[in-house]
Curated annotation (Swiss-Prot):
It comes from Staphylococcus haemolyticus (strain JCSC1435). One of its GO terms (molecular function) is DNA-directed RNA polymerase activity. The keyword Membrane does not apply. This is DNA-directed RNA polymerase subunit epsilon. GO terms for biological process: DNA-templated transcription.
Length: 72
């Protein structure tokens, strides 16, 4: 399992504006699994990145909302 950081807008109809970008963390096997997990939400997904090593540790320590959802 890996942790993915998902950058998104709350509404698929919104134009992507960096200042309105939200993030969530999702644990899954692949990016495709994470996308399937989120498909029923009305999110306009900008980008998904896999977090590993020092990057993952940094997010755990410095994110105010590091709560991981499970895509299983």
């Amino acid at each position: 399992m890996a942790v993915f950081k998902v950058f998104f807008q709350h509404n698929k109809d919104e134009v992507i504006v960096r200042e309105n970008t939200n993030t969530i963390y999702v644990e899954g096997e692949t990016e495709e699994q994470v996308r399937r997990y989120l498909k029923d939400r009305n999110y306009n997904i900008e980008f998904i990145t896999k977090l590993e090593g020092a990057h993952l540790e940094y997010e755990k320590e410095h994110s105010d909302h590091f709560n991981v959802e499970n895509a299983q």
